[in-house]
Amino acid sequence: MEYSPKYYSNLKKRYPNVAQSFDKFASECAKAGPLDKKTQKLIKLGTAVGIGSEGDVQNLAIQALAGSASSDEIRHAVLLSATTVGFPRMIVALQWVEEVIAAQKN
């Protein structure tokens, strides 16, 4: 399952140089420290839960699954957000993740 948030896809079409610069920035941030890719994706997933971004939560869940994260690790990352972002935001994010996991199984 491939997923690209609609707004980012639109940005890439309209402003390809801006999108390319952002992608380069994101890549440099990822290389700047000792965290492995799976840990990076799970941290970013928690951040996406915090801002309540469905597209980012689903995109990062897809990326984490495509890497080495298990479905249970992804669920755990979302569950951990509850004490910081609140139960309602966590539970809706968990549903977004479950949709991705279900789609991956099909």
Task: Name every feature range the model reports, one short phrase each.
Residues 22, 42-49, 77-84:
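Short alpha-helical scaffolding segments that buttress acidic/His motifs in well-ordered protein cores
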